[in-house]
């Protein structure tokens, strides 16, 4: 591809992911809190539910959610926010998760250990006669099972509390497809949409998040063979480079190539289930 081709695709992706050219953290806080409040009221439901991992994304989305239900209550609408801890056994960075909960200050906190359910599903697959090709493949699939079990737990609580499940996907993760389809990607509302990673961090900082939360190394921590593996190691590019791409800045050719490869390979993750009416005929 030529430089002009790269730039053209970059502009199209930025528009698709709704990344604004201008950014003001305080304005984004006000806009997103209002969005969350208006949406919950419009549904007639009463509760927001979100899993808190300890990272900056869930911490930021959680604090925005809590502020939105407080705004609703001040306006006379009964609303609550439930923050869920969803460890797989003992979480390696549990101290970070507890720090995040203290920052979010949710109306209610629940802890559900997903390990028994995730391990049971893996065991059931083995009992069926299914065999994985390698231990690494099994570990990867098991990691996605954990992510989906976490969403099962959140929807169970939402179903019992007249609730809506919040997701933490933002423009950088959406660009790279770095989420589990129907796991952490399977939510009802995405208050961080349109923000790249550095802007999520700026919002967290403006909300009063301490630097240990704001600058925590992002990790999905789903694979037991590679615990706490940083997202950037999986990407092969840094969040700064991804964020530059999303802000329309020029990046190195290898960054363009890597970002576009991830974006194209994960297109199906950003789409609703396909039907024959969606599939191109040409």
UniProtKB/Swiss-Prot annotation:
UniProt keyword Magnesium present: yes
Record's catalysed reaction(s): deamido-NAD(+) + NH4(+) + ATP = AMP + diphosphate + NAD(+) + H(+)
Similarity comment: Belongs to the NAD synthetase family.
Positions annotated to bind deamido-NAD(+): 148, 181, 188, 268-269
Keyword DNA-binding: no
EC code(s) of this entry: 6.3.1.5
GO terms of biological process kind: NAD biosynthetic process
Keyword terms of this UniProt record: ATP-binding, Ligase, Magnesium, Metal-binding, NAD, Nucleotide-binding
Gene: nadE
Any one GO molecular function term: NAD+ synthase (glutamine-hydrolyzing) activity
The protein's enzyme class: ligase
Positions with a binding annotation for Mg(2+): 57, 173
InterPro entries, per database record: NAD/GMP_synthase, NAD_synthase, NH(3)-dep_NAD(+)_synth, Rossmann-like_a/b/a_fold
Assembly and oligomerization: Homodimer.
Pfam families: NAD_synthase
HAMAP family in alphabetical order: NadE_ammonia_dep (MF_00193)
Recorded metabolic or biological pathway in which this protein acts: Cofactor biosynthesis; NAD(+) biosynthesis; NAD(+) from deamido-NAD(+) (ammonia route): step 1/1
Protein name: NH(3)-dependent NAD(+) synthetase
